[in-house]
Design a protein with these regions (language model features):
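Face-selective signature of the C-terminal outer-membrane beta-barrel domain
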Residues: 239-247, 284-437, 462, 519-525, ...
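Short acidic/polar hinge/loop motifs at secondary-structure boundaries
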Residues: 116-117, 124-150
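Conserved C-terminal beta-signal and adjacent last beta-strands/turns
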Residues: 14-15, 197, 235, 247, ...
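Gram-negative outer-membrane beta-barrel transporters
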Residues: 349-350, 419, 522-529, 547-643, ...
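Surface-exposed extracellular loop regions of Gram-negative outer-membrane beta-barrel proteins
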Residues: 252-267, 372-379, 427-438, 447, ...
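Transmembrane beta-barrel wall of Gram-negative outer-membrane proteins
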Residues: 177, 184-213, 218-256, 281-303, ...
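N-terminal Sec signal peptide and the immediately downstream disordered periplasmic leader
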Residues: 1-74, 78-82, 234-235, 716
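Membrane-embedded beta-barrel scaffold of Gram-negative outer-membrane proteins
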Residues: 293-295, 303-321, 462, 468-474, ...
Length: 717
């Protein structure tokens, strides 16, 4: 084939990758990060072996530090990952709850925290063994990159891996460097940051701290948060290194405005339900963790990596459960106090070599994680005084642990073909010891064991150096979390050990292209079929119970394109279409116990709530190293059902943001400043939803037009 014809073929593939899905997304269509220039040597590690995303048979995106920090508040991860296709990240404007994250529909049902998606910060799991996670302890001011892995290969991370999000701190600078930043804006938002980095006498260090506070967009939504993060790196003369990571989070008080009903959302989106004020709904969190990573190269072909970590997290949450509802002897109260001790290890061996003259990479390892959680419940009143800690109503020690051996390999079969395969054997154990045995509230101790074998295989074909095709298939599983096990149906006490894990079969087909003229593009088609999906059974009195209910299907298309022109002009487009439905019908209820007459049938074919069928993202940025810079971005999100019965949904929304700034040098200092506007068209929309909220308060409003002004200064000695 002559060069002209080959070039024409490549251009047709690239343009087809963009145009065909764009037509399919005319109704609703989500995003990927603005990265470095096309053909830049970008490397990711989400598959446990360093490789370029272009050479991996999986959907994977890398968000760099410039995207994370340029013109941003650096408060929530949702600011940075909005451009990743298949990933829906929502800022709930409620710091008593974590950012709402779902990947290809996994995690969408979570009413608080993050579930269905595995989270890691500097290699340390931010997801507990039960599958429940949080990511509020990330200091974005010292973050180097975020990697997002979607599709079948996520299962190699074990339980609850509908997707994998990994956050990595900066590596130590070669010269001592200090950095200071401040940003402030609408609704009393203020963020202060400081960082020191350098290398001296064989020790590399990055030490950072940030403080954030806000009055909140809505009434009763003020919050304050302080994060500290330190990364220390020691090298030795034998090809090894030790990295110590220390992280702390302090959230002394975050008011919880709760959700709003459709009527409340329409009349006063900044308002709050009266019950939030009556009971002073709020949350506080205190967390400290430390991890150690030991990397040792044995020889040219073999390396070992050992991770050890431990941490402690205290959480206290005051809810708005009415006094009368807590009258029953089996009710656990309206205050939840959790004291969590967690620890774990991951030992990994990597071998690189050649077989039949073809290169291969083999990774084998063993992961163990454990959580001990003391769950105590209290009444949220004393006499006629509401919103205070009252009488003890629950006291138990819950433990969850996993023990997972895993192995994966990539073999280059020829100059064009490569095959990647892996397997993980996941064992998850739950135990509960009841310490509150009073009257008719008997001993509710119990245990459960879950296990699954999770195979994955993928193949990649290099059509030429600019176009790669791939296909991947795998199996995943998702156990119930401790929060989903916490309450038994029909008012019974004890954990709901009748719940079983959901099991999924995943398939993905994709094409990746890169061109110096046309930029980088990806297109992925995927389908996930799940059996024994965990869904809501009842939701009443501030408590949700769950059940296994038949089958679901998640089918969709993701497309992304990015390019850099004239070195500094960066353009990006990302699209997602996701059809997530229940394949089987089931019953749900808004009262406990749930008599048959009160049950509502969720019809087969209903959409899974919390998931937009389509979303689209586009951005254009002028980003020279020094001088004036600016960017504009737009995001369109389709309607989002709020419950399993699909009785209501958020309206479609289009949100536009823009920022302009300047970067310069002055007497050895690098100085920068910016101003940013979000929702500059002042659209009214729901930024997130509380799925299956029992009182009909589904809607969490997003702010109107907001402004942010920020500046930073750094100096390298």
């Amino acid at each position: 084939m002559d060069k002209r014809r080959c070039s024409t073929t490549r251009r047709a593939v690239v343009i087809g990758t963009l145009v065909l899905p764009a037509a399919a997304f005319a109704q609703d269509a989500a995003p990927r990060p603005a990265g470095a220039a096309s053909l830049a040597p970008v490397v990711v590690t989400a598959t446990r072996a360093e490789a370029a995303p272009f050479d991996i048979p999986a959907s994977i995106d890398r968000i760099g530090s410039e995207t994370i920090r340029d013109g941003r508040a650096q408060v929530n991860i949702s600011e940075s990952v909005g451009g990743v296709p298949g990933l829906l990240a929502r800022d709930r404007q409620n710091y008593a709850q974590d950012v709402q994250i779902s990947v290809r529909g996994f995690g969408a049902r979570s009413t608080f925290g993050i579930r269905g998606v595995r989270l890691y910060v500097d290699g340390i799991p931010a997801t507990f063994p039960d599958g429940q996670g949080q990511i509020s302890n990330v200091d974005l001011g010292s973050t180097d990159r975020i990697e997002v892995l979607r599709g079948p290969f996520s299962a190699l991370y074990g339980n609850s891996s509908g997707g994998v999000i990994q956050v990595f701190s900066e590596e130590p600078a070669t010269r001592p460097t200090v950095d200071f930043s401040i940003a402030g804006g609408s609704d009393g938002v203020v963020r202060l940051g400081a960082k020191a980095s350098g290398t001296a006498a064989g020790l590399g260090y990055v030490v950072a701290a940030s403080h954030f506070r806000t009055d909140g967009y809505r009434d009763h939504s003020a919050a304050e948060r302080t994060i500290g993060n330190a990364k220390l790196k020691f090298g030795n003369d034998t090809g090894g290194s030790i990295t110590v990571i220390v992280n702390s989070l302090n959230l002394p008080r975050a008011q919880d405005p709760l959700g709003l009903t459709r009527a409340q959302f329409g009349s006063d989106p900044r308002g709050v339900d009266a019950s939030a004020l009556q009971f002073d709904t709020r949350k506080n969190v205190d967390q400290t963790q430390v991890g150690l990573i030991y990397d040792q190269r044995i020889d040219a072909a073999n390396a070992l990596r050992l991770l050890i970590y431990t941490g402690h997290r205290n959480t206290t949450q005051f809810q708005s459960i009415p006094v009368a509802t807590q009258a029953g002897p089996l009710h656990p109260g309206g205050v939840i106090a959790l004291s969590s001790d967690y620890r774990g290890t991951d030992l990994r061996w990597t071998n690189r070599g050649r077989v039949a003259e073809q290169p291969y990479t083999l990774v084998a390892g063993l992961a163990y994680d454990t959580l001990e959680q003391r769950r105590v419940g209290y009444q949220n009143f004393v006499g006629t005084t509401l919103g205070v800690q009252g009488a003890l109503r629950r006291d138990e020690l819950d433990t969850a642990s996993d023990f997972d051996p895993y192995a994966q390999a990539t073999v280059q079969l020829s100059t064009r073909w490569s095959v990647s395969a892996g397997v993980r054997r996941s064992h998850v154990r739950f135990d509960s010891v009841d310490h509150y045995i009073v009257g008719t509230n008997g001993n509710d101790s119990g245990s459960a064991r879950y296990a699954a074998t999770l195979p994955v295989i993928g193949a990649l074909f290099a059509l030429d150096e600019h176009v790669h095709l791939y296909a991947t298939a795998g199996r995943g599983f998702e156990t119930p979390t401790l929060n989903e096990l916490a309450y038994s149906p029909n008012g019974a006490t004890g954990l709901n050990f009748a719940l079983r894990p959901a099991k999924s079969d995943n398939l993905e087909l994709g094409v990746k292209t890169r061109s110096a003229d046309l930029g980088d593009a990806t297109l992925a088609l995927f389908e996930t079929r799940t059996q024994q999906e965990i869904v809501t059974l009842t939701n009443a009195g501030g408590r949700s119970t769950f059940q296994n209910a038949g089958a679901t299907r998640r089918r969709g298309v993701e497309a992304a394109w990015s390019a850099t022109y004239a070195q500094n002009l960066r353009a990006q487009i990302a699209l997602t279409y996701l059809d997530a439905i229940y394949r089987d019908s089931f019953l749900t209820c808004n009262i406990t116990p749930c008599p048959a007459a009160s049950a509502q049938r969720v019809a087969a074919g209903n959409r899974i709530p919390g998931v937009a069928r389509g979303s689209a993202y586009a951005s254009l940025a002028w980003a020279p190293v020094f001088g004036w810079r600016g960017a504009v971005d737009a995001r369109r999100t389709g309607m989002v059902p709020v419950n399993d019965t699909n009785s209501d949904a958020t309206p479609r929304s289009i949100v536009v943001g823009a920022n302009v700034g300047y970067v310069g040098r002055f007497d050895g200092w690098q100085l920068s400043g910016f101003v940013r506007g979000d929702n500059v068209l002042a659209k009214r929309y729901a930024g997130s939803v509380i799925v299956n909220e029992g009182n009909g308060r589904f809607f969490e409003p997003a702010p109107g037009r907001t402004w942010l002004l920020g500046t930073s200064a750094s100096y390298a000695f």
